[in-house]
């Protein structure tokens, strides 16, 4: 049983995040346990990098096929956007009734500061080689062609996400719901009706139901860096005071 908590992508040395490079070894170890009938993965992520999400999703599926092990995924507080994409690596997905599931979409957001810098008397000077190098510069006026280019990229990424969900969930999806791929998110209870998950329950409960009360659950955790260990030790000490 391994856990994938946090934002997907590089978030810094002190903040916990989910990255392919830092999770690869732990995922390999989980699948290398010969006696294990299945690998359980708990996800608690609102999403993040689409690239890292796809890399982790594909690696889990590859390891599952290579080692002939079933993958059972459990959504904790949230498995949304890239978090749900990773969850689709599971042969089965479970969640709490109050978990947040879905958000099958792509988002880009920024600010425009052109009027602000003019108001405070700041001149913006940009020198580029390549006419599109300053695309979506927040200190310049938006260009319709730049917006359209961004939207086209978003549509491609969105379709890739949809393909993963449709391949993973196959006939389980309630495709009559027009909101399914709109970027909307739902509770675990509603997600079950939509076919985004297979059932309601937590990891230990479901694993006992499937493999018996005496099931042995081996836990895998990513090793912490020395600074994170130091801070964690300090927090534990403070809790005991």
Predicted regions and their residues:
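N-terminal organellar transit peptides
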Residues: 1-96, 107-241
């Amino acid at each position: 049983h391994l856990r994938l908590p946090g934002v997907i992508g590089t978030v810094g040395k002190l903040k916990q995040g989910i990255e392919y490079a830092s999770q690869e070894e732990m995922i390999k170890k989980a699948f290398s346990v010969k006696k294990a009938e299945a690998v359980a993965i708990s996800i608690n992520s609102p999403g993040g990098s689409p690239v890292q999400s796809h890399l982790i999703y594909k690696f889990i599926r590859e390891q599952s096929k290579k080692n002939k092990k079933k993958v059972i995924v459990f959504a904790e507080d949230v498995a949304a956007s890239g978090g749900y994409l990773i969850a689709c690596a599971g042969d089965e997905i479970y969640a709490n009734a109050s978990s947040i599931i879905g958000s099958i979409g792509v988002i880009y957001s920024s600010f425009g500061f052109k009027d602000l810098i003019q108001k405070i008397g700041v001149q913006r000077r940009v020198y580029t080689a390549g006419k599109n190098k300053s695309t979506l510069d927040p200190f310049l006026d938006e260009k319709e062609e730049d917006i359209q280019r961004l939207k086209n990229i978003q549509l491609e990424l969105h379709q890739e996400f949809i393909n993963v969900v449709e391949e993973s969930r196959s006939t389980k999806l309630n495709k009559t719901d027009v909101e399914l791929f709109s970027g909307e998110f739902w509770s675990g209870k509603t997600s079950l009706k939509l076919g985004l998950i297979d059932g309601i329950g937590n990891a230990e409960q479901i694993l006992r139901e499937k493999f018996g009360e005496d099931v042995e659950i081996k836990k895998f955790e990513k090793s912490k860096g020395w600074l994170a260990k130091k801070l964690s030790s300090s927090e534990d000490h403070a809790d005991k005071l």
